[in-house]
Amino acid sequence: MALKGRALYDFHSENKEEISIQQDEDLVIFSETSLDGWLQGQNSRGETGLFPASYVEIVRSGISTNHADYSSSPAGSPGAQVSLYNSPSVASPARSGGGSGFLSNQGSFEEDDDDDWDDWDDGCTVVEEPRAGGLGTNGHPPLNLSYPGAYPSQHMAFRPKPPLERQDSLASAKRGSVVGRNLNRFSCFVRSGVEAFILGDVPMMAKIAETYSIEMGPRGPQWKANPHPFACSVEDPTKQTKFKGIKSYISYKLTPTHAASPVYRRYKHFDWLYNRLLHKFTVISVPHLPEKQATGRFEEDFIEKRKRRLILWMDHMTSHPVLSQYEGFQHFLSCLDDKQWKMGKRRAEKDEMVGASFLLTFQIPTEHQDLQDVEDRVDTFKAFSKKMDDSVLQLSTVASELVRKHVGGFRKEFQKLGSAFQAISHSFQMDPPFCSEALNSAISHTGRTYEAIGEMFAEQPKNDLFQMLDTLSLYQGLLSNFPDIIHLQKGAFAKVKESQRMSDEGRMVQDEADGIRRRCRVVGFALQAEMNHFHQRRELDFKHMMQNYLRQQILFYQRVGQQLEKTLRMYDNL
C-alpha cells in the first residue's frame, strides 16, 4: 500500500527514471521496500519515479516520524558489507543496443527445453526477455511495476565479501578507511561491476583460463593481434519451416576460413550470441546486430538488407582481436553437433569471467602512463566520438533522403521528361505529308531513353547508397556504446583521486590507494586499446565506403552517358 513520506534533502534527477524532490516536500511512497537504496514514489507535482531512500522519511499515522532505516536490506547503505561481484549463477547487467542497462534472467541451465534452439521464435529476442521486476532503461526498474514486492531480489547479484580473496594484499582490518561507493547504484559504473573491481572487491580466480594481452604500439596501447586470424562469410539466406509449416524462419550459411564445414544459423542464434557478448565484454564496444522486424521479415528486400548488415557485423567481429577469440563465438561458428551445441551454450551461459571478472583476464604493459595524460586522451576521444556520432547521423539522414529521391522524385521527373518527348513525337505524326519518320523515331527513342534513365536512378541506391547506409548504421551502434564505456573510466579516475586524497589526509593507507591506482591502469589500458582499434577499423571501413560509393557513381553516370550517346547518334543522319 502507498505510504506518505517527506523529503529530507533536495535531489535532482539525472535520467528519466528518476524524479526530483525538494526538502520538506510531501511524497507518496509506493512501497518501503528499497532496491539498492532507491524507492519509487510520486512527488507533489504528480511525477512518478525513483529517488534515494536515504533522502526521505516515512510519515506514519499517529506516530512521530522516524527516518527510515534501510541498512538491513541487501541493498543497504553504500558502506554495507556486500560485494557487487556477480555470482555466475545470476545474470549480471549488460549494455543494450542503445547504451542502456538491463538484467537478463537466465533461469536454470539444466533444462533441456531451454536449449532447443529450433523452438525459438523469431518474434522475440533474448534481450527482450527480462522478467517483471527486471531493470529498464538506464538500469532502473520499470515504472509500471505493481506493489508491494515490485523489486524481486532474485534479479540482483549480491554476496558477502570474501575476507581473504581481496585483490589487495592488505587485510581490510588494516585499512584506515574505504573509498565511498556511488550513491546512484544504477549507474553503469556500478552495474558493470567496474566500481567493485577498482575498489578490489572482485575475488581473484584460482585459475584464469583465458587471457587477453595489451601491448604498446605506435599510437599507444593496442590489443595484441589474434594469433590465428580468420574471416567468415555470410551467405545464402534460406527460408526454412518446421512443425509442418506452422513456423518459418530464415537461416544463414556461415563459412569460417578456419573451419572445415559451413554452419547454418538463424537470427535468433545471432541474438543469443550478442547477448552473451554484452554480458561478458564490459569495456569493449560490441557491434549492434541489424534491427529486428515484426512484419515483412520474409520479404526479399528485408532479407537482403539483413544479410548485408550481418556481413558487416561478422567482419567487425572477426577483425576484433578480443571478440574473435571468445570461446562462445568460436562455438557459434564451428559447432555442427546438436549435443555439443547445447553443452557449449551452457558453458557460455555459466562463464564466470564476465563483467567485472573479465577485467581480471587482461595482461597490461609495464610502461608507466600518467593518469592525467590518460584522462586527457579519454576526454579528446569523448569529444571526437560525440562529433563523429553527430556527423554520421547527418550523413545517414542525407543519404536516406537521397534514396527516397532516387526511388521517387528522380524517377518521376525523368519519366515526365520522357513522356513529354514522346508527346512531341506523336504530335509530329498528325500531319502525314510533312511527317519525318526518322525524326519522329529519334525523338520517341529519346523519350524512352529518359524513362529508362529514370528506372536506372531508382535502382542505383542498391549499388552505392545502401552500402553507405549499412556502414553508417554499424558505426552509429558502435559510437552509441562509448558514452557508457567512457563513463566507466571516468568513474575509475574519480576513485583514484578520492583514494589519494584520503591517503594524504591519513584516512587510508598508501598501499590501498596504490592498489586502486593499479586497477585503474587496467581499465585505462583496456579503454585506450579499444579506442585504438576503433580508429584502425574506422579508417579502413570509411576508406572502403567512400571508394565503393565513388566507383559506383562513376559507373552509373558512365551508363547514363552511354545511353545518351546512343540516342544522340540517331540524329546524325537526318
Curated annotation (Swiss-Prot):
Detected in heart and pancreas. The keyword Cell inner membrane does not apply. Keywords: Cell cycle, Cell division, Cytoplasm, Cytoplasmic vesicle, Endocytosis, Membrane, Mitosis, Phosphoprotein, Protein transport, SH3 domain, Transport. Signal peptide: none annotated. The keyword 4Fe-4S does not apply. Residues 371-574 form the BAR domain. The modification Phosphoserine is found at residues 77, 92. One of its GO terms (cellular component) is cytoplasmic vesicle. CDD domains: BAR_SNX33, SH3_SNX33. InterPro entries: AH/BAR_dom_sf (IPR027267), PX_dom (IPR001683), PX_dom_sf (IPR036871), SH3-like_dom_sf (IPR036028), SH3_domain (IPR001452), SNX33_BAR (IPR037427), Snx9_fam (IPR014536), Sorting_nexin_WASP-bd-dom (IPR019497). Residues 1-61 form the SH3 domain. The PX and BAR domains mediate association with membranes and are required for membrane tubulation. Homodimer (via BAR domain). Interacts with ADAM15. Interacts with FASLG. Interacts (via SH3 domain) with DNM1 and DNM2. Interacts with WASL. Interacts with FCHSD1 (via the F-BAR domain). PANTHER family: SORTING NEXIN, SORTING NEXIN-33. This is Sorting nexin-33. It comes from Homo sapiens (Human).
